[in-house]
Amino acid sequence: KMTDKVLLDEWKEDHGIDSDFFKVRVLGQFPDVGSRQLISGSAVREARERELHPSEYDAMPIAIGCDVARFGSDETVILVRQGRRILSLQTYRELDNVQVAMQCAEVYRKYHQASLFVDEVGLGSGVVDTLKSLNYPVVGVNAGRSPEDKTRFFNLRAEMWYRMKEWCESGVDIIDDNVLCEQLASIEYGYSPTEQVKIEKKEDMRKRGLSSPDRAEALALTFAYIIPPQQMQGSFEADDYL
């Protein structure tokens, strides 16, 4: 349609054909590997194409991550990861805190002895409170808090995302989801004045024409805290239970 061509021409003029916006929105490509790109497009593509045998992950602990929508255009996402494989990803819009909590509870009941991590910043605090009132063993995650490695990372969000980066590069099997893959390959990083790793803010991603990385954030939440090895069956190296 002519209107589509006009819109594409406007995007070309406003953002440029080499911009992340144009590559993701128009060409359906991952951004090129750049000096500020946290997770390479090639690592994401390989993880998307890989299929692990159940024996490679079914004895590993299960982690559930819930990123709660903050704005109308954002998604609430519940993602389930078992070791090196993503088991499921569900997205929702326009749910209140109680409804989100009920969805989390339903997913939790499906998986035995899973660890449940919920973003407790903003509206997420109500979800965490509701789950706690129902006696679910939820862990509220405030990504702005101090990380375990305070020398290397600016905050917990940077630490979570970097753990996820290392996981993505370790022979994993991620779900075949275009939006998740685009979000993983689009995030950028930098350094604080004290040389700590910082992850790009959602507001800065929007300035680049990209949407809030809600699905990737849900995956990152599963790396908020290392799951104790006593929750695993069999013998594994320390890196295996991230």
PLM regions: where:
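ATPase catalytic-site recognition across NTP-hydrolyzing enzymes
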Residues: 1-66, 80
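Mg2+-dependent endonuclease catalytic cores in nucleic-acid-processing enzymes, primarily RNase H-like
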Residues: 84-197, 236-242
